[in-house]
């Protein structure tokens, strides 16, 4: 059956700021306390979406979350009206305010893990929400992510959206950022590669930075998504690269159809994995980048592998890259050599995503890949599909509501909270989502 990959990109939230919340993500740590520009950030993302949609790659949007997230502060014992809570936490525990104001839901590669209908035992598209257990600010995301996905993939005859795994470290799950699918045509059965950083009975794990994904979680997600057991491979990421800042597999590898583009040090027992894939995937091609050409540290600094690898109509592939790759002489030299060689990657497109990149999120972080047949695509909420009208509407919406300068101190401004809620109210109507946010369901609580 004919199917296409649709990229659902996350809209950057109104509270996008640099707080250094993500230990193990070196860009996040390095840019802590810098001044951010939320309006520029959301527009950089929109420009990428529109450019790819115009080039014939189906695009859709996933909205941001409600931030600052007052219900989480109430859970932490802060009381009073919303405004009083903001004031208290800003004075008493500003780090909590930063955490509940994080715009991290924009990195929708961590929203869920997707199984296309061609791989599922019941013939439906499955999406399992990620619990993002390793970081407090990300563990807040799962309930609203689930509500958003249910509002987008609302036809239960075509889609199954599963709640996140229990919030325990043993089942730490980071979503599609640790998942690849390889195969031929999108509509044919593929091989799903689940990548983990640790497992309970295995002493091999990173020493410096946390391994966020457990094998136990990956196995549970594969079961929930009803992936045919004959079409699954579980592989461990190299713990040494996790300790060099590769906090998700999509910082060191990207796949599309029959191609796996990765660093030579990406996986533990990499030769064994490559041989497995060669046996299981017709026409499989591994493009392994040697450390002598691009070091792991340069790959992390430029997000070479946090790129999008997209299939064009002629069978060739386009590599979508952040501008940092072009700015790095060695990486850019390697890339120009790559596209000149005999392999499916024949073209590159560079985007300026500096606002997201400074928090450790490149092109691949910003998108959730969903393979859909034509019938399934028609069943998706049509209001989220990117086109000229939506691009114009979202730019106008951003101009109206987004600030062009934000610091950690601004997060305590009650106006920011009100602006955000008004903006999301408007957005849910624009995207026909219904009442997906807690403030819409309970009213803006006064205490």
UniProtKB/Swiss-Prot annotation:
Pathway: Amino-acid degradation; L-arginine degradation via AST pathway; L-glutamate and succinate from L-arginine: step 2/5
UniProt GO BP: arginine catabolic process to glutamate; arginine catabolic process to succinate
Pfam families linked: AstB (PF04996)
Keywords: Arginine metabolism, Hydrolase
Entry annotation: catalytic residues: 174, 248, 365 (nucleophile)
InterPro entries in the record: AstB_sf, SuccinylArg_d-Hdrlase_AstB
EC number per UniProt: 3.5.3.23
Positions with a binding annotation for substrate: 19-28, 110, 137-138, 212, 250, 359
UniProt entry tagged with the keyword Hydrolase: yes
Enzyme's top EC category: hydrolase
Keyword rRNA processing (UniProt): no
Molecular function GO labels: N-succinylarginine dihydrolase activity
Annotated catalysed reactions: N(2)-succinyl-L-arginine + 2 H2O + 2 H(+) = N(2)-succinyl-L-ornithine + 2 NH4(+) + CO2
Family the entry assigns: Belongs to the succinylarginine dihydrolase family.
Subunit (UniProt): Homodimer.
Entry function: Catalyzes the hydrolysis of N(2)-succinylarginine into N(2)-succinylornithine, ammonia and CO(2).
Name this polypeptide is given: N-succinylarginine dihydrolase
Organism: Salmonella typhi
Originating gene: astB
């Amino acid at each position: 059956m004919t199917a296409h990959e649709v990229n659902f990109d996350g809209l950057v939230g109104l509270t996008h700021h640099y707080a250094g919340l993500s230990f193990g993500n070196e860009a996040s740590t390095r840019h802590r306390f810098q001044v951010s520009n939320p309006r520029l950030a959301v527009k950089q993302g929109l420009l990428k979406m529109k450019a790819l949609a115009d080039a014939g790659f189906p695009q859709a949007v996933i909205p941001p979350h409600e931030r600052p997230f007052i219900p989480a502060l109430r859970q932490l014992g802060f009381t009073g009206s919303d405004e009083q809570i903001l004031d208290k936490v800003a004075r008493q525990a500003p780090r909590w305010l930063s955490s509940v104001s994080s715009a991290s839901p924009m990195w929708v590669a961590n929203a869920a893990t997707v199984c296309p209908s061609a791989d599922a035992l019941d013939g439906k598209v499955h999406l399992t929400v990620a619990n993002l257990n390793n970081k407090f600010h990300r563990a807040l995301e799962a309930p609203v992510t689930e509500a958003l996905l249910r509002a987008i993939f609302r036809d239960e005859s075509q889609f199954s959206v599963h709640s996140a795994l229990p919030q325990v470290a043993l089942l730490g799950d980071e979503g599609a950022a640790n998942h690849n699918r390889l195969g031929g045509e999108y509509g044919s059965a593929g091989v799903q590669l689940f990548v983990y950083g640790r497992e309970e009975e295995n002493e091999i794990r990173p020493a410096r930075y946390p391994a966020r994904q457990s094998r136990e979680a990956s196995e549970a997600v594969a079961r929930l998504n009803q992936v045919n057991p004959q079409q699954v491979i579980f592989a461990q990421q190299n713990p040494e690269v996790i300790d060099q800042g590769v906090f998700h597999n999509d910082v060191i590898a990207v796949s599309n159809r029959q191609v796996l583009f990765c660093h030579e040090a990406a996986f533990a027992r990499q030769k064994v994995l490559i041989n497995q894939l060669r046996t299981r995937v017709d026409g499989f091609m591994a493009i392994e980048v040697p450390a002598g050409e691009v070091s792991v540290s340069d790959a992390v600094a430029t997000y070479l592998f946090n790129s999008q690898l997209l299939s064009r109509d002629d069978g060739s592939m386009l590599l979508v890259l952040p501008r940092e790759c072009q700015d790095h002489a060695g990486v850019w030299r390697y890339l120009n050599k790559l596209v000149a060689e005999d392999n499916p990657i024949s073209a590159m497109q560079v985007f300026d995503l500096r606002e997201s990149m400074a928090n450790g999120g490149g092109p691949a972080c910003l998108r959730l890949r969903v393979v859909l047949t034509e019938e399934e695509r028609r069943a998706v909420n049509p209001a989220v599909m990117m086109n000229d009208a939506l691009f114009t509407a979202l730019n106008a919406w951003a101009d109206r509501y987004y600030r062009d300068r934000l610091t950690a101190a601004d997060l305590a401004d009650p106006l920011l909270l009100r602006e955000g809620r008004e903006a999301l109210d408007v957005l849910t109507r624009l995207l026909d989502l219904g009442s997906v946010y807690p403030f819409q369901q309970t009213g803006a609580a006064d205490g």
